[in-house]
Amino acid sequence: MSVFRALWLGLLVLAAPSLWAASLQAELVDSAGQPLGSAVISLQGPLGEAPQAAPGLMDQRAQQFVPHVLAVRTGTAVSFPNSDDIRHHVYSFSPAKRFELRLYKGTPSAPVLFDTPGVVVLGCNIHDWMLGYVYVTDDPWFAVSDEQGRVQLDALPPGRYRVSLWHPKLADMLSQPGGELQLGEGLSTQRYSLAVQAAVAAPGSAPKSSFGDAFKQARDAAQ
């Protein structure tokens, strides 16, 4: 076998997973058909090598949690840096993860491990209007929509998937089934409608009761 042929075959083997992989480009909308940001789509599908869970990051900027919704795989460690020039006191009473990071600036020395699937509602004990969410899932493939309601998932094994959808404004904060999806090689496009009336209000504008209401919904959903 010539050196050129051996090199060509080696490159083909390395490229094969990406050549045979599927991609999903999805548009998430509310019940009025408007783009829905901060919505989670997750996929459970064929057995195969799942992407390695990357560390998560939930920042605090301008007295807001950024991003408003963070999706992570079960077992992910999440850091909570404070980029503001004032101190924050982050906490959650949600059944999926109870924790407290007392008044601090900068970045706490240890991240928080999210080892139970579910919705974790975040608040700040100093700034009552701050509200954020960590969506913890066992599904290996997931993404959060941007302000235009768009998501893209790449390097998916071709096959049949079960789709789950979630948004903070869903009734009882329970995930919504998105049906089944058959993905072949290449790019597929889908549109999903979630049963919510409007997109999430801009973080920082929520009334002071929002954390209590959101926590109660997450607690009830876990029961």
How should these model regions be labeled?
Residues M1-W8:
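Bacterial N-terminal signal peptides that target proteins for export
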Residues G10-L11, D30:
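Residue-level detector of alpha-helical transmembrane segments in integral membrane proteins
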Residues A21-Q223:
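Extracytoplasmic copper-binding redox domains, predominantly the cupredoxin/blue-copper superfamily
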Residues V13-L14, Y135:
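Small beta-barrel nucleic-acid-binding modules, principally OB-folds
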Residues A15-A16, A21:
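N-terminal signal peptide c-region/cleavage motif recognized by signal peptidases
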